[in-house]
Amino acid sequence: MRGLLVAIAAFVCFGTAPSHAQPASQFKVTILIPATPVTGVPDKVFVLLTTDCPPGVGTGRHTHPGDEYGTMMEGSVLTRQEGGEWKTVNAGQSYYVPANIIHETKNVGTVATKAVNAFVLEKDKPRFTPVQ
């Protein structure tokens, strides 16, 4: 799991593997807490990470095998969940994406964004799955 980038997603997303359809030099993921067992829930892991996203870069449509919780620390992004409207998430605001929901985020601003994302994921599944 540690080898896949996410995104925050969201941005999410949320290291050491391919990014969300963007060159790794553009979208940076820093793992703060790698996949760690959740006490009393043997099939789940917790992951904490930050994402840095320059202007004009997005995550593309994707899913996660678990819930995503995030807070935008710097900048703002547009985000939407499958079937929903685009929404703006600004610095200081938090967001939630349920497990397996197709979603995407893009930085349409003029400054880089930074987000902190926490995930409770299914153990042994990729953290980020692109969707066409």
Show the residue positions of the predicted features.
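Short acidic-glycine-tyrosine-enriched beta hairpin
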Residues: D52-P54, G83-N100
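A short beta-loop-beta micro-motif enriched in histidine and acidic residues
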Residues: P42-V45, G56-T71
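Ligand-binding loop in jelly-roll beta-barrel domains
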Residues: N100-D124
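Short histidine-centered beta-strand/loop micro-motifs
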Residues: T59-H64, Q81, T88, K106-V108
